[in-house]
């Protein structure tokens, strides 16, 4: 085939895959439709090799036109064990159900290979749209998928994607935390974050913390990432007293749990010596001492807004991609007593 004509081709067809693999179109359809177990291993392997060689991708849009919408929404999650992810997923499922849609969830477990597998599978799924909360290490594949179906990001911005984003106003949340700690008399503040790892929400919180500390007179701020070194680093921070009353700001629920694991030995006296404000408000926060002061994320509103954005795109909205940042709510508990 002429090279120029080959390059001009925009999409390999299922007929070409069937011809190259020596099987019928129905057999290829069965393979890409998730019924691989019905095929002989040799046949499935031959089809798989041809698909990879030709770069074939199922035409999801054409399939949708033939069969109509499935009223299925896909959701790609980085870590289904993360309390934030669970809360948002529940909110998305609720909003989908209210609008007559069902939710299909794929969990990557923060694993790049698994994320790639799910993306490849989602290219063949007949979902009407996709909500994404993931590490984004395969932004190219996500961008390609976004050309085929509506997509909305939750919590994490991916520069390569021009899609709607719904999440927390991270700068405002950090400002609320530091305003509260400052007003309560804390002067030496340590922020603890999960590893940044290119995750935009974590980066925004750390950057906002550093910028806010720099603007405030009399405050000292440091940042640590959760790692195997955290116990020693926390001990070093506590031993460096001298700049004034100390406090911790944990940047999400996972970081809060890690901090508390290493500080639980202090028992009920903990918050008499050290303040703590945590971003996220988990069920166990009120149970620790006099309770942990928290910045509650409006997860139900975030989820509902993400679904609404997706539905608007499904209805044909051509508005420019937008970012919706929702405000956290400060909940004061016993972990931030006033210091003289």
Swiss-Prot record:
It comes from the Bacteria. PROSITE patterns: HTH_LACI_1, HTH_LACI_2. Keywords: DNA-binding, Repressor, Transcription, Transcription regulation. Signal peptide: none annotated. Pfam families: LacI, Peripla_BP_3. Residues 12-67 form the HTH lacI-type domain. GO terms for molecular function: DNA-binding transcription factor activity; transcription cis-regulatory region binding. 2-ketogluconate acts as a molecular effector and causes dissociation of PtxS from its target promoter. Glucose negatively affects the molecular binding of PtxS and 2KGA, and gluconic acid inhibits the PtxS-2KGA binding reaction. Residues 14-33 bind DNA. Contains an N-terminal helix-turn-helix DNA-binding domain and a C-terminal domain that binds the effector. Homodimer. Involved in the regulation of 2-ketogluconic acid metabolism via the control of the expression of the kgu operon. Binds directly to a 14-bp palindrome sequence via its conserved HTH motif. This is HTH-type transcriptional regulator PtxS. It comes from Pseudomonas plecoglossicida. The lineage of its organism: Bacteria, Pseudomonadati, Pseudomonadota, Gammaproteobacteria, Pseudomonadales.
């Amino acid at each position: 085939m002429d090279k120029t004509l080959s390059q001009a081709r925009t999409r390999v067809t299922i007929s070409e895959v069937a011809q190259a693999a020596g099987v019928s179109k129905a057999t290829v359809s069965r393979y890409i439709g998730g019924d691989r177990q019905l095929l002989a291993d040799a046949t499935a392997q031959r089809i798989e090799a041809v698909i990879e060689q030709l770069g074939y991708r199922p035409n999801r849009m054409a399939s949708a036109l033939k069969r109509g919408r499935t009223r299925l929404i896909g959701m790609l999650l980085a870590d289904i064990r993360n309390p934030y992810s669970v809360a948002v997923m529940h909110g998305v499922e609720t909003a989908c159900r209210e609008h007559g849609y069902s939710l299909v969830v794929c969990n990557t477990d923060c694993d790049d290979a698994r994320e790639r597998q799910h993306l490849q599978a989602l290219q063949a799924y007949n979902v009407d749209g996709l909500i994404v909360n993931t590490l984004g290490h395969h932004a190219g594949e996500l961008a390609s998928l976004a050309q085929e179906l509506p997509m909305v990001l939750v919590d994490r911005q991916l520069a390569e994607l021009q899609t709607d984003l719904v999440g927390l106003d991270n700068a405002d949340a950090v400002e609320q935390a530091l305003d509260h700690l400052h007003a309560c008399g804390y002067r030496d503040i340590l922020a603890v974050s999960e590893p940044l790892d290119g995750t935009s929400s974590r980066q925004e919180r750390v950057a906002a913390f550093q910028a806010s500390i720099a603007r405030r007179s009399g405050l000292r701020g440091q940042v640590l990432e959760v790692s195997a070194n955290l116990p020693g680093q926390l001990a070093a921070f506590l031993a460096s007293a001298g700049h004034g009353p100390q406090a911790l700001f944990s940047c999400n629920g996972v970081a809060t749990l890690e901090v508390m694991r290493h500080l639980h030995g202090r028992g009920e006296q903990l918050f008499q010596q050290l303040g703590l404000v945590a971003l996220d408000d988990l069920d166990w926060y009120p149970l620790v001492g006099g309770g942990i002061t928290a910045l509650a994320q409006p997860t139900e509103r975030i989820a509902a807004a993400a679904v609404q954005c997706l539905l608007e795109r499904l209805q044909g909205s051509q508005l420019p991609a937008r970012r919706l940042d929702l405000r956290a709510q400060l909940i004061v508990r016993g972990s931030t007593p006033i210091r003289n």
